[in-house]
Amino acid sequence: MDLKDAYLSVPIHAGHSKYLRFEWESDLWEFTCLPFGLSSAPRVFTKVMKPVIGRVRSQGIRSVIYLDDMAVISPSNDQSNLDSQFVIETLQSVGFLINWEKSVLKPCKWIQFLGFTIDSSSMTVSLLQEKLNKLIERASATLHHPKRSIREVAEVIGLIVSTFPAIKLARLHYRHLEFSKVNALKENLNDFDAACSLSQEAKDELEWFSTRCYLYNGTSIKKHSSVMVLTADASQSGWGVTFEYQLTNGEWSIVEKKQHINWLELQTVLLGLQSFLSSSCGGNVIKVFCDNSTAVAYVNNMGGKIVSLNCITYSIWELCLSFDCSIEAFHVPGVQNVCADRLSRKHESSLEWKLHPTVFKWIAEHYFAPDTDLFASRLNYQVGRYVSWKPDPSAWAVDAFSVVWSDPSSG
């Protein structure tokens, strides 16, 4: 549904028209309505539309609006007709004009809206092919341009951001481009026409958009029925995770203990997923509950401005995708995150010991070289393959006594 000359339907207070004057052929003119081209006009128009759309949604009508374009979503053909009629009457009652030529008022299951294709049969939102082709071409051109400017990189980033509703993984593959742009602006005193040097990671992101983004065009808008729950919490001493009815925890290494709490919280989510995800989780949505709002934001936004946190977030999403899982994070007050909090503070320090590496190396050289460490953790294992006594991020197996050793000679 499209509004005709939408801005011009909004009158300007008589005393304020003098601020909207312009000169044309020696004559002085002033706007008596909201003009196009005014930088504040989109925000003003959006605020004017708020109570109107509020009225529509108060009737249980689901709608999506961007400035003067609106889509109405209804559960059936008949309901769609009723909802559309109510929206039209509401808009007309406050003085707006419907652009009948550009509006699609007949109920349909497939429609183009704001450069996207909404398909209620497959329940997906996809990018129009022409927009997808433009993104691929611009990404490829920028990647291979020997003297690309900061402005050119910024324009590509803008194109990428505009695809977020349709290409879900786009959020995961543009952060290093943004980092390169920001660093280049700092080095060149905000001169957008200066040359922009890209890191290898940024080039890899452009390569992804040039060659692979089309594979992920189409985001599902269907609610997932299969859900698995993970709760996570971190303290300065360790981490704790629950997954469904399973528990695990661990201590931080000396290096990890020096990290910021936001890093620890996000790392806890990664360690928990590494400990529990398996092929049986495929097709599920992993709902993560955490009492750290930064960790929640990074997971849901597929990254952020801090490089170290962005790297962990990338690992989280790559891990979930490798098991055909999706992930959503939710904030939970610390007082309600009881089990994970307790696990993050409860540690058996006496279990985290090992032979001195030099001693172990001497024994391995003079007697035998084991290929499996049977009682170890991610902090004290001595060989590449190890068995932990509880779920562990990198363990080959859990509980050495429960492993079936059918061929002792094979280790």
Q: Language model features by range: what are they?
A:
Residues S26-V48, A141, E244-Q267, L271, ...:
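A short, polar/acidic, helix/strand-boundary loop motif
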Residues K4-W29, F45-R55, S121, S126-E130, ...:
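Reverse-transcriptase-like RNA-dependent polymerase core
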Residues Y7, L28-G60, R148-L172, L273:
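Conserved pre-motif C helix in the palm subdomain of viral-like polymerases
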Residues R62-V64, V72-A141, A154, I221, ...:
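Polymerase palm active-site segment centered on the conserved acidic dipeptide of motif C
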Residues L273-C339:
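RNase H catalytic domain
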Residues L105-I221, G334:
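C-terminal reverse transcriptase regions that engage the nucleic-acid substrate
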Residues M1-I12, E152-E155, L230-A232:
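Conserved catalytic palm subdomain of right-hand nucleotidyl-transferase polymerases, strongest
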Residues P42-T90, G272-C290:
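Active-site palm subdomain of RNA-directed nucleic acid polymerases
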